[in-house]
Regions:
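SAM cofactor-binding core of SAM-dependent methyltransferases
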Residues: 5, 14-109
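Conserved proline-anchored active-site loop of SAM-dependent methyltransferases
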Residues: 32-47, 116-131, 154-159, 242
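A short, conserved alpha-helix within the catalytic core of class I
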Residues: 129-143
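Conserved beta-strand signature within the Rossmann-like core of class I S-adenosyl-L-methionine
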Residues: 146-165
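Flexible, glycine-/basic-rich loop-and-beta segments that form/coincide
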Residues: 170, 176-177, 246-273
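Conserved beta strand-loop-helix elements of the APE1-like EEP
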Residues: 214, 239-248
């Protein structure tokens, strides 16, 4: 069954398409694997417009990575994804794993399928902040270097959902937010909010920046985020790219900063890959 989404998610997918097409072009002949965590069924339906569209998995498959590995959340999603990805398969280049990304054994299965000679790109788009843990990010980075020591590139859709903002000041939610960040430094943001020293906009900014600091502390040369062009105000997420190359940062900003129409809108025009 297609995943039900809102128009802001459609906007996110259009931005992702521009990003992943441009990113794949800079690979040229380099061997690189695409790893999709928290993968869904492969297609989605917009609640606002009742139109169907490809999800991120099929959009990525239209680019030129050497291998694609998707971690589906459950068996129905895995079966749907297997059916929809079949036309794109060449030389056994698509693999689908079923499991929870927070489990060590799932991460091991994922990287067992990645050749040591290949670099990797990981797309992390969790179904809410409770689904993402800092420990998982660290495991991915630890497993993800190629034989030359090149660190894995990460594109993280950081969830700035209302649930995170509401739960920030709830004692019973401290454990889940601490798992997201891997530390308790976020409590300083919480206290500043409770003391009335910062508003909601600054809370959002500091939550994103704190996550970026953690990625920088893991050794990445470039960690950047961008607030999506005003489609949802405030935005429900921030894309964050962690890479040792500055090229990907420019691609991120180009993809998410430009105004755009959606497929359901009259002036929409699909850009073709160069």
């Amino acid at each position: 069954m297609p995943r039900q989404i809102r128009k802001w998610t459609c906007h996110k997918l259009e931005c992702f398409t521009d990003f992943i097409e441009a990113y794949a072009r800079i690979l040229e002949n380099a061997e690189c694997c695409y790893l999709g965590l928290y993968s869904g069924s492969g297609n989605c339906a917009c609640k606002d417009t009742d139109c169907n569209m490809d999800d991120s998995e099929l959009r990525a498959l239209k680019t030129r990575f050497n291998r694609y590995i998707f971690v589906a959340r459950n068996q129905p999603d895995a079966e749907s994804l297997k059916r929809l990805t079949e036309p794109y398969k060449t030389d056994n280049n698509v693999k689908i794993i079923t499991g929870n990304c927070i489990r060590e054994e799932v991460i091991h299965r994922l990287f067992d399928l990645v050749p040591r000679s290949a670099s990797s790109f990981v797309f992390i788009d969790p179904p809410g902040y409770r689904g993402m843990r800092w420990a998982t990010i660290k495991k991915i980075i630890a497993h993800g270097s190629d034989w030359k020591g090149h660190r894995i590139d990460l594109l993280i859709i950081f969830p700035l959902e209302m649930a995170l903002l509401r739960n920030l000041t709830r004692p019973e939610c401290e454990a889940s937010i601490t798992r997201l960040y891997g530390n308790r430094k976020w409590l300083e943001i919480k206290q500043a909010r409770l003391d009335g020293k910062i508003g909601l906009s600054e809370v959002r900014h500091q939550l994103v920046e704190l996550f970026k600091v953690g990625l920088k502390d893991l050794g990445y040369k470039h960690v950047e985020s961008i607030e999506p062009t005003q489609f949802a105000n405030p935005p429900f997420y921030h894309p964050i790219l962690a890479s040792d190359s500055a090229t990907g940062i420019k691609i991120l900003k180009d993809a998410w900063s430009k105004p755009r129409y959606l497929p359901c809108e009259l002036l929409y025009k699909k850009e073709t890959s160069h």
